[in-house]
Amino acid sequence: MTVAVAQAGPRAVQAPPVIPVLADVWAALAGVPDPEIPVISIVELGIVRDVAWDGCRLVVKVTPTYSGCPATEMINTLIREALAAIGIADVAVVNQLSPAWSTDWIAPEARVRLKAYGIAPPHVMGGRIDVSGISPLRRAHVVVPCPRCDSTNTQLLSQFGSTACKAQYRCSDCLEPFDYFKPH
């Protein structure tokens, strides 16, 4: 926290702490990468739902991508560290489970970077409920273009890729394996 000290005679007087504006808070959070997909930030991923001051305490509401996401604690720690770096020591990170996170909340520019990183971005669901990732028996045929060569000649290898929120695919044209960020 930034504290200004003014000299007024023989005693120093401390000015009240300077509270960062919310735009600075959002900018700091936009610099926090997702631990499992470091090419996009937690803001671009759409998991930071709200930021508000409650007196001198900053409250950050976060909706995890999955309620059991193993990166949740790491994300909370990274949030606190990023905000401490701009002088905010009193931070409450609140996990907000409702409404559930949707891949529709991923920013368009983040989808472009996912593809460049080698992860096929999820289809935009537009509010539809998709159960295709829940059970292989319910899985509808989903065309997942290869993020490397854009071929649609791809096949599902495993419902789970490098993380639970991704499936493993392989391109039949360039023969490269790749992750697909499952929509939900």
Residue ranges and their predicted role:
Residues 1-184:
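Domain-level signature for proteins that mediate thiol-based redox and metal-cofactor handling
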